[in-house]
Amino acid sequence: MRMMKNNNNETVTVIGIDHGYGNMKTATRCFPSGVARYDKEPIFQNNLLVYNGMYYQIGEEHKEFCAEKTQDEDYYVLTLAAIAKELDGKGMNRAKVHIAAGLPLTWVATQKEDFQKYLLQNERVDFTFRNKEYHVEFAGADIYPQGFAATFYRLQDFKGINMLADIGNGTMNIMYINNSRPLEKKCFTEKYGTHQCVLAVRESLLKELGTVVDDLVIEQVIRTGTADIGEKYLTVIRKAAGDYTKEIFHKLREREYNPELRRLYVVGGGSCMIQNFGEYDKSRVTIVRDICATAKGYEAMTVRKIQRNGGMLV
């Protein structure tokens, strides 16, 4: 979150938000991108958001994959929660907010305008989150290519020919960056993320051991490489995750990845799969484990845009 004065001398709060299928991320916060809607006030209210007369439990479960993030109200409600978390971190509950967000690389051209309108559907909004009232006015919304934003602070490192893989919960975005310049015609989006890995592991457990294991356990092994479970279960999960990670590298090779000819940069929450289960030359592959890197990049790009238009940080 960055406080700025725009060229009209208005104070605006820039908040970068990464609308993931698995997690919502801001520059300083990360929470599951699940929404459960209730007509009446629910019993448990730890992450309750009240908006427009409805009750929403935030972070109950992951958001299912959808080709368009504007197809329901979930991401709007999650956006309000993300804004509230950032404002609360600064002891604020009122602001004029400029959203910096993004979409998968190959979706930006066709969905950018609709997503921008979706985020700005209200000029101002009053809502309650975790028993605290918020009053937000919207100053604007910028939409950037997902993945590329995560490299914003380190573009100078992209000398020569490079491939960027942004592995999220629902998609993997692939981009070529040559001599610090992204190649627009070399951008691809694959439906190949950590959620699909969980499904593959779940199927292996059922096939090999006839057992259903909670997704939270599977996700922990994917994220950390281990969990407090029996060795036979751990072995099957690791094997399935390793096989899935090999498929990720196969997808990259289909997009002309050759480790001897280009460096690979891996970002996003799914980068843990590469780190924990991948077979690769560590001198040729860089893994960026900051799950908030993309949100930070969105935020930084909007700050730069406002500065170029005569604004300044305050």
Please report, for each region that a protein language model flagged, where it lies by residue.
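Conserved blade-register residue in beta-propeller folds
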Residues: 26, 174-176
